[in-house]
């Protein structure tokens, strides 16, 4: 390929564009063209992004249900051996590196779970691996247990319980802030952890796309895709944080 042909190819793929120029085109929805296959980056990214959001929110929902059940159960039994052992057990289990846990569960699936539909089981295994391996369930369980324990020891809660009045309404209202805090903080970590889980399970999400674009193919890295996927993940995390910050005053009027 001659130098002139190289320049034409660079211009066609947008490799000669400056960084400010990339931002200007981004404002009109143009993220450029993939260096490897010539496909529009926006169309390529949104398909993978939807898969990652399903994985992340699915894992967050499953992790929260398990962690809330364990955490609130432990809070109503402070100091009991069983509650302490349960919290300790999930903490130890979550210390296993996420890539090692993913490989182990993948091997278990290949050996023992072949009779189940592959798509649904593989997706569920990825969700649980992401939740446990990233420490989300153990962190949520400890945080919710501590927050609920402190709430139950407050004077007004002791007075409510002494009157044999249901504490459900007071408990739910005062636990919303701790729940929002832990959910928003773990969401960012889950997004980053999807890179490992998607690679282990060959799940075509944005983490898999980013890692695949970073790997050199024919001496090329797909920089337009890398820039777009990185920006997308940062934007999602920022919007999640902003949403939680805006919800706080609505949930707790004392913050207004």
Features from the language model and the residues they span:
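An internal, D/E-rich "acidic patch" concept
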Residues: 10-64, 68
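Amphipathic alpha-helical recognition patches that constitute DNA-binding helices
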Residues: 14, 18, 22, 40, ...
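A short secondary-structure junction motif
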Residues: 26-30, 112, 151
